[in-house]
UniProtKB/Swiss-Prot annotation:
This is Uncharacterized HTH-type transcriptional regulator YidP. It comes from Escherichia coli (strain K12). It comes from the Bacteria. InterPro entries: Bact_HTH_transcr_reg, Chorismate_lyase_/UTRA_dom_sf, Tscrpt_reg_HTH_GntR, UTRA, WH-like_DNA-bd_sf, WH_DNA-bd_sf. GO terms for biological process: negative regulation of DNA-templated transcription. GO terms for molecular function: DNA binding; DNA-binding transcription factor activity. Residues 28-47 bind DNA. SMART domains: HTH_GNTR, UTRA. Keywords: DNA-binding, Transcription, Transcription regulation.
Length: 238
């Protein structure tokens, strides 16, 4: 439907640098002229923005931006907590599982360790402003992180690895796949079944080449925006 398309286009605009929190949106008449649709269509599009929690209507004043989606820029590697702090958002974590287990073949292969070598397995839900943003299953070699605790997992793993363990993170390999939430994911993420999610696999390595962490994450696609800055490489002229 056209109002949904307009709502998505407005959402992208509201998440840009052109708008800050508490910015006043253009009026219905101006938006109707811009999109060449009726004011009723614009009203329905704004209703969606209200339902998404991005804007509020103030009687006699207008419609205001009250929340932006989480923006993760990919020009450099930053942890989720670092990103959110820069955006002034509050992040908390609920650790559902934290245990030591023998590495199964698939995980051992990712971390470049021996099969059955001891690893930490953790499952946690990351909340932003009290709403679930991400479910993460994480695997880390015990030999590298002897003192990893529940308290560390409730905070930032990047901070723990670099500041407490003194290991510099060199980079990260990631792959993204769109999926639909099954019953278990829907319950843990507090969304309806078949809600679109982003499945992200992540493999972090140190400056010295050791593999530190392998994670499988599910992020709420309606609450998470990725912005890429990619440079084109040109062959050197002889």
């Amino acid at each position: 439907m056209i109002y949904k398309s307009i709502a998505e286009r407005l959402r992208i605009r509201l998440n840009s640098a052109d708008f800050t929190l508490n910015s006043l949106l253009p009026g219905e008449k101006k938006l109707a002229e811009e999109f060449a649709v009726s004011r009723m269509t614009i009203r329905k599009a704004i209703d969606l923005l209200v339902a998404w929690g991005l804007v509020v209507r103030r009687h006699g004043s207008g419609t205001y931006l009250v929340r932006k989606d989480v923006l993760h820029q990919t020009a450099s590697l930053t942890g989720l907590v670092e990103v959110l702090k820069r955006q002034g958002k509050t992040v908390t974590s609920q650790v559902l599982i934290f245990e030591i287990m023998p590495a199964p073949p698939a995980i051992a292969s990712q971390l470049r360790i021996q099969i059955n070598e001891q690893i930490y397995f953790s499952r946690r839900v990351r909340f932003v402003e009290g709403k679930p943003l991400m479910l993460e299953d994480s695997y880390m070699p015990v030999k590298l992180f002897r003192n990893l605790s529940l308290q560390h997992l409730e905070g930032s793993k990047f901070e723990y690895i670099e500041q407490e363990c003194g290991i510099l993170i060199g980079g990260n390999y990631e792959s993204l796949t769109p999926v639909l939430a099954d019953r278990l994911l829907a319950r843990q993420m507090k969304v309806a079944e078949h809600t679109p999610l982003l499945r992200i696999t992540s493999l972090s390595y140190s400056e010295s080449g050791e593999f530190l962490n392998y994670s499988v994450m599910f992020r709420n696609a309606s609450e998470y925006q990725v912005e890429y800055h990619l440079r084109r490489l040109h062959p050197e002229k002889s």
